Amino acid sequence: MSFFDSVKLDLVGRLFGIRNRGLAVTCCAVAVASIIAFPYIRRDYQTFLSGGPSYAPQNIRGYLIVCVLALFRQEQKGLAIYDRLPEKRRWLPDLPPRDGPRPITTSHIIQRQRNQAPDLKFALEELKATVIPRVQARHTDLTHLSLSKFEFHAEAIFLLPSVPIDDPKNVPSHDTVRRTKREIAHMHDYHDYTLHLALAAQDGKEVVSKGWGQRHPLAGPGVPGPPTEWTFIYAPRNEEELAVVEMIIEASIGYMTNDPAGKTIA
């Protein structure tokens, strides 16, 4: 260490009342790292706020929560994971590939879409507060509407409390249903019009492989988050894409309610 470095450390020690030279070095390193990292942290915090309302409060406390949870982030687009899951039935037909590249999504575990937004007129007339209620209305014997357990500002489709899930013979997706607290699907129609929903493994594989969505960043085995089947669906941009998205919601309801229309695949 040079004479000048030694003098600097002595000054830092005197300034903060630190007598231990090693502690002074550590404090200097932390201070320099904080100064360097501050612009990134500030941008990252703004990105977190831009994601809109979610389960994490939109303040420093919420930001710290998502930063800690990000330590458990999982890969979101691989397909091999689906073949390891026991459910082999499908409720979706073969889907057409989604037009264009995948949208850019947020780097945070609060999953949002950052580009390819639907036209505002289409969103307000065809998506906002209409998609989830419209699909649920076809399944009132097994489902009901309530606020999401994951996104406290979103209306969600739930399996009725009267439907038993303790016996695997009644609902083969019983573990998934339990982990989502009976929630089947919700749309972020207060923000970017994306959705989260639970899909049977082979339906999830179809959705991800055709570019219609990806898994939740905390969805995976051994992770303290939603089940592997919890899937993020990109916002529909037109009537054709909306029709596909509604089919995906229908498939989610079919899986979570054990609709016998599910087809076993080889």
Swiss-Prot record:
Keywords: Membrane, Oxidoreductase, Transmembrane, Transmembrane helix. It catalyses: 3-hydroxyhispidin + O2 = (E)-caffeoylpyruvate + hnu + CO2; 3-hydroxyhispidin + O2 = 4-[(E)-2-(3,4-dihydroxyphenyl)ethenyl]-1,7-dihydroxy-2,3,5-trioxabicyclo[2.2.2]oct-7-en-6-one. The availability of a complete eukaryotic luciferin biosynthesis pathway provides several applications in biomedicine and bioengineering. Luciferase; part of the gene cluster that mediates the fungal bioluminescence cycle. Uses the fungal luciferin 3-hydroxyhispidin as a substrate to produce an endoperoxide as a high-energy intermediate with decomposition that yields oxyluciferin (also known as caffeoylpyruvate) and light emission. The fungal bioluminescence cycle begins with the hispidin synthetase that catalyzes the formation of hispidin which is further hydroxylated by the hispidin-3-hydroxylase, yielding the fungal luciferin 3-hydroxyhispidin. One of its GO terms (molecular function) is oxidoreductase activity. Its main location: membrane. GO terms for cellular component: membrane. Belongs to the fungal luciferase family. Its EC number is 1.-.-.-. It is found in: Membrane. It comes from the Eukaryota. Disulfide bonds: none annotated. It is a single-pass membrane protein. It comes from Armillaria mellea (Honey mushroom). This is Luciferase.
